[in-house]
Amino acid sequence: MVQASRTIKVNTDPNEPRLTRGLVWRGLMMKAENPLPFVPVISACRIVERQSADKFVREIVDKGDTITEVVTFYPERMVKFERTSGRVLGTILNEIIEEVDGDLALKFTFSLTVEGIAADSAEEREFAATMEQGYLMAVAATLKAMRKLAKESALPAAS
């Protein structure tokens, strides 16, 4: 099983727009609905089924692999992506947290199994390192896109 968790502070640059919890939440919702502007390795996304206001099934193409995910919103706190089909199965969490110092942060956690790779193997460790680096880049891209949208006033707070 490939597991990793990283936390990135949201408001580190005083010259950038300050993102509130509401703005970050709205950005995460937008990312869940259409990840293309936020995650460079995702080339396609289609909502397959809406199960409720806080839950839907989507199909994404991630580095050429087609993956089905059940996406669940926990308002103002977390988005859960449960990968149910594809080569890589498991759970990805995008959480909005407050650190001990009170600063807002995004915590990205994944717990995944990879088809065709033996548990605790060198290949699994290499996959984990590559995936972790990809997620750090995705977090940076997500925050950059949120700031751009905030500057353009295209990122309204969730209502």
Task: Map each language-model feature to its residues.
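Hydrophobic ligand-binding cavity/cleft-lining segments
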Residues: 1-46
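Intrinsic-disorder/low-complexity, polar/charged segments enriched in Ser/Thr/Lys/Arg/Asp/Glu/Gln
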Residues: 3-5, 42, 55, 66, ...
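Beta-strand elements of well-folded, non-transmembrane domains
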Residues: 10-12, 62-64, 112-116
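Short solvent-exposed loop/turn micro-motifs enriched in small/polar/acidic residues
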Residues: 38-40, 64, 88-90
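Hydrophobic/aromatic beta-strand elements that line small-molecule binding cavities or substrate pockets
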Residues: 44-46, 68-72, 91-99
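Glycine-rich portal/gate segments that line the openings of hydrophobic small-molecule binding cavities
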Residues: 47-85
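Beta-strand/loop substructures that line and gate deep hydrophobic ligand-binding cavities in soluble
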Residues: 85-137
